Amino acid sequence: MPKIKTNRGAAKRFRKTGSGKIRRNKAFTSHILTKKSTKRKRELRQGTLVAKADQKNISRLIPYI
């Protein structure tokens, strides 16, 4: 049985925590930043966890990470 390929796009966007949960970065941080408040941009810098409903699908994309 061959190994499962890692989805390289997902590998660059997600990483697993020590307890096995999946971390992600928030969106809306790359452009059109002048109209966003400093507080909003600061809060967008903080990473967050993937929703429980999406966790299984993302785990399949990054099996060895």
Curated annotation (Swiss-Prot):
GO molecular function: structural constituent of ribosome
Pfam families the record matches: Ribosomal_L35p
Composition bias, Basic residues: 10-26
Residue span of region Disordered: 1-28
GO biological process entries: translation
GO CC terms of this entry: cytosolic large ribosomal subunit
Keywords per UniProt: Ribonucleoprotein, Ribosomal protein
Keyword Heme: no
Coiled coil regions, renumbered to chain: none
NCBIfam families assigned: rpmI_bact (TIGR00001)
Family stated for the protein in its record: Belongs to the bacterial ribosomal protein bL35 family.
PANTHER family reported in the protein's UniProt record: 54S RIBOSOMAL PROTEIN BL35M, LARGE RIBOSOMAL SUBUNIT PROTEIN BL35M
Official protein name in the record: Large ribosomal subunit protein bL35
